[in-house]
Amino acid sequence: MTETEILERIRSIFQENFAIDPARVTPEAHLFEELDLDSIDAVDLAIKLQEMTGRRIKPEEFKSVRTVGDVIGAVQSLLAA
């Protein structure tokens, strides 16, 4: 899966689960400050990413995720594992 494909899947997750306009979901966008996610949303996002990749995300790894670009990197790491 390419970075562009991952971004498109993430945009879809944000639109369907958090009612966020996909145009706002850019690699530079901050999850908490710009996209207004909270800690519960972050847990929901981690679950959706696990469903998308079929792999479990370690909570300590996901704690460092702050931007959409970080989410893309986390998905790439999961897919490479």
From Swiss-Prot:
Modified residues (O-(pantetheine 4'-phosphoryl)serine): 39
Predominant localisation class: cytoplasm
Family: Belongs to the acyl carrier protein (ACP) family.
GO molecular function terms listed in the Swiss-Prot or TrEMBL record: acyl binding; acyl carrier activity
Annotated organism of origin: Ralstonia nicotianae (strain ATCC BAA-1114 / GMI1000) (Ralstonia solanacearum)
PTM annotation: 4'-phosphopantetheine is transferred from CoA to a specific serine of apo-ACP by AcpS. This modification is essential for activity because fatty acids are bound in thioester linkage to the sulfhydryl of the prosthetic group.
Pathway involvement of the protein, from the record: Lipid metabolism; fatty acid biosynthesis
Example of a GO biological process term: lipid A biosynthetic process
Gene designation: acpP2
The UniProt record lists the keyword Phosphoprotein: yes
Annotated GO CC locations: cytosol; membrane
Name of the protein in its database record: Acyl carrier protein 2
Free-text function comment from the UniProt entry: Carrier of the growing fatty acid chain in fatty acid biosynthesis.
Pfam (any one): PP-binding
Subcellular localization: Cytoplasm
Domain Carrier: 1-79
Record key words, sorted: Cytoplasm, Fatty acid biosynthesis, Fatty acid metabolism, Lipid biosynthesis, Lipid metabolism, Phosphopantetheine, Phosphoprotein, Plasmid
Organism superkingdom: Bacteria
InterPro entries: ACP, ACP-like_sf, PP-bd_ACP
